[in-house]
Amino acid sequence: MILLISDLHLQEERPDITRAFLDLLDGRARHAKALYILGDFFEAWIGDDAMTPFQRSICQALRQLSDSGTTIYLMHGNRDFLIGQAFCQAAGCTLLDDPSVIELGGEAVLLMHGDTLCTRDVGYMKLRRYLRNPLSLWILRHLPLSTRQKLARKLRSESKSQTRMKNTEIVDVTPDEVPKVMAAHGVRTLVHGHTHRPAIHKLVIDGQPARRIVLGDWDRRGWALQVDEQGFQLAPFEFS
């Protein structure tokens, strides 16, 4: 069994989500061959050198799962792209490139966080290119801690206000971008998060059936994609 999740946005202000995640680690994830976390694992991450006690506790929980035999893969999201190798080594997980193609359920599957599919959100795409530039990343990681904290708060506030103002179609994936990206990687299944719109979309690419599986965000309930001998099963679960 393989589990895929995304968009937990873990933060101290949401202990219910944290508890649900820890329950997953102690339950289904213990029986999984691998756990894939496809971005926005944390609500914010300003650097491996600035881990809070809360974030350290999550790191320790991941390490316990890794030590139990479950392989953990972590992909950057738009809110936690400063997660680095120091955190991954401590947590016992492997940092996964976005995008990545893996073998899953007997087929090649494309994994993405999903933000790069939202090409109609021109403002965000421009900001993303700037922030992910190697020079920008180096500067961000070397800013004083207080400056990084202020910048993170500012970016989060602006992101929330702009998302509320934007047309819902703009912040969703661009329909034409999906088949183009899937064809470029030679896959018939795409799994991503980011949009907070969980669903399994049936597609046709080059005359062949295909599908786009969108993982859900953890807010009022959790979401996980389970891949086993029964196939691909996307389902929510209630917080206990």
Curated annotation (Swiss-Prot):
Its cofactor is Mn(2+). Mn(2+) 2 binds at residues 40, 78, 113, 194. GO terms for molecular function: manganese ion binding; UDP-2,3-diacylglucosamine hydrolase activity. Its EC number is 3.6.1.54. It is a peripheral membrane protein. Keywords: Cell inner membrane, Cell membrane, Hydrolase, Lipid A biosynthesis, Lipid biosynthesis, Lipid metabolism, Manganese, Membrane, Metal-binding. Pathway: Glycolipid biosynthesis; lipid IV(A) biosynthesis; lipid IV(A) from (3R)-3-hydroxytetradecanoyl-[acyl-carrier-protein] and UDP-N-acetyl-alpha-D-glucosamine: step 4/6. Coiled coil: none annotated. GO terms for biological process: lipid A biosynthetic process. The keyword Lipid biosynthesis applies. Mn(2+) 1 binds at residues 7, 9, 40, 196. It is found in: Cell inner membrane. InterPro entries: Calcineurin-like_PHP_ApaH, LpxH-like, Metallo-depent_PP-like, UDP-diacylglucosamine_Hdrlase. It is an enzyme of class 3 (hydrolase). Binds 2 Mn(2+) ions per subunit in a binuclear metal center. Substrate binds at residues 78-79, 121, 159, 163, 166, 194. GO terms for cellular component: cytoplasm; extrinsic component of plasma membrane. It catalyses: UDP-2-N,3-O-bis[(3R)-3-hydroxytetradecanoyl]-alpha-D-glucosamine + H2O = 2-N,3-O-bis[(3R)-3-hydroxytetradecanoyl]-alpha-D-glucosaminyl 1-phosphate + UMP + 2 H(+). Belongs to the LpxH family. Hydrolyzes the pyrophosphate bond of UDP-2,3-diacylglucosamine to yield 2,3-diacylglucosamine 1-phosphate (lipid X) and UMP by catalyzing the attack of water at the alpha-P atom. Involved in the biosynthesis of lipid A, a phosphorylated glycolipid that anchors the lipopolysaccharide to the outer membrane of the cell. This is UDP-2,3-diacylglucosamine hydrolase. It comes from Pseudomonas entomophila (strain L48). The gene is lpxH.
